[in-house]
C-alpha cells in the first residue's frame, strides 16, 4: 500500500511508518508537501483538526496511486483554563473515508503562550528560548521538556495509531456507519 504523508518532517514520516508497521500493515510511505492553506500554528481544536484533514487530503491527491493520505497537525487547545499542545492525525482514503486520532497533549510553558497564541509556530518559539535549532524536526518541545524521555515522535506515533484503529480488520464492523 502506498501511503502519502502531508509533510517533509522526518519525525512525522517515521511515526507514520512505525504506526503502520505496529499493526502489520505493509506500507510504502511517500512524503508530500503540506498545503499552503494550513497555518504554521493552528489555535483551537477545530483549526488543528482541519489542518490534519487538509494535509491528509492534499497528500492523497499529490501522490499517484496512494491508498491513504495521512496528515499530522500539532496546535493549541484550551481546556479548563489551561493551554495545551495537542497532536491530531487524520487518515483519508481514496473512497473519501476519514478517520481521526489524537495523541497525548501537554501544557504549554507560560513564557511561550503569548507568541504561540499570536500565530508563531511553537518550534520557532522553543528554538529561540532554548537557543537550539530545528527542535521541531528533532525531539520537539516535549523532548526538550522531558529530556528526550518523550519526544515529538512519540506524540505523532500515538496520534497515527489512534487514527488507524478504526481501519484495523478486526474493527471493521464496529466502525460501519449505521
Curated annotation (Swiss-Prot):
**GO terms (BP aspect):** nucleotide metabolic process; thiamine metabolic process
* Molecular function GO labels: ITPase activity; metal ion binding; nucleotide binding; ribonucleoside triphosphate phosphatase activity
Q: Which domain of life is it from?
A: Archaea
What is the E.C. number?
3.6.1.73
- For the protein in the UniProt heading, the enzyme class is hydrolase
Q: Does the keyword Kinase apply?
A: no
* InterPro entries, per database record: ITPase-like_fam, Non_canon_purine_NTPase, NTPase/PRRC1, YjjX_NTPase
Q: Which Pfam families match?
A: NTPase_I-T (PF01931)
Q: Does the keyword Protein biosynthesis apply?
A: no
Keywords assigned by UniProt, alphabetized? Hydrolase, Magnesium, Manganese, Metal-binding, Nucleotide metabolism, Nucleotide-binding
Q: Which reaction does it catalyse?
A: XTP + H2O = XDP + phosphate + H(+); ITP + H2O = IDP + phosphate + H(+)
Where does the signal peptide begin and end? Answer: none
Q: How does the cofactor attach, per the note?
A: Binds 1 divalent metal cation per subunit; can use either Mg(2+) or Mn(2+).
Instruction: Please list the cofactors this protein needs.
Output: Mg(2+); Mn(2+)
What is this protein for, i.e. what is its function? Phosphatase that hydrolyzes non-canonical purine nucleotides such as XTP and ITP to their respective diphosphate derivatives. Probably excludes non-canonical purines from DNA/RNA precursor pool, thus preventing their incorporation into DNA/RNA and avoiding chromosomal lesions.
**Protein family (similarity comment):** Belongs to the YjjX NTPase family.
Subunit text:
Homodimer.
Q: What is this protein called?
A: Probable inosine/xanthosine triphosphatase
